[in-house]
Amino acid sequence: MTILLSHTSALEALRRLGCIRQEPIGADAVALDCAPDALRAAALWESALPGTPQAPLHVQVPQGSPRTRGGALVTHPMGEPPAGEVLSLCKGLACPTPSQLLVQLEPRLTRLELLVLMEELMGTYAVRPDAPRGMVARPSPLLAPEELETRLGLAGSATNHRKLRWALDRAVPGSASPRESKLVLRLSLQASLGGYGLAVAGLNQGLAVAGIA
């Protein structure tokens, strides 16, 4: 049986993946554990990811399973994730893709919080409080805008996921640090949100310069 991390624990796992971009696995290949054990979950984490996870661990269980709160493990009964929206961390442990994680977190975060998180997932850094600089660099983003657009398209209705769609319309991929993310949002957001309303073409993109003859 597979333990599927969720919410803040899934975000922590994605941040600890660093430069590794996992390939999604089919939802039919994941048999979710209905009654996950906290000790087994922690042991699987330590075999797949660096460091000790923050407690409590948040995990997804099948719809209708008992809800567990308190202690070292919190369970979230939910429907099965869409096909291709699960990443295998090791045998027995998985987490949602970045796009699926944003869908999970949408009800819990404000529009601006979602936008800041989107900047991180679409950038080349991961927030890591345990790291000396509070972040670590990675060579490529974990999420592309079109991947999130595809995931939101599965909702079926244009009125679904309004906060995520709002954030996606304003996200600028390619940020290399939290400070860059804050700067680009300050420049690009409208004045009512504390920004300057400037058009930002992109971040950290290559620029071809013609040689001087």
Q: Where do the PLM segments sit?
A:
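Surface segments flanking catalytic/ligand-binding clefts of nucleic-acid enzymes
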Residues: A137-A213
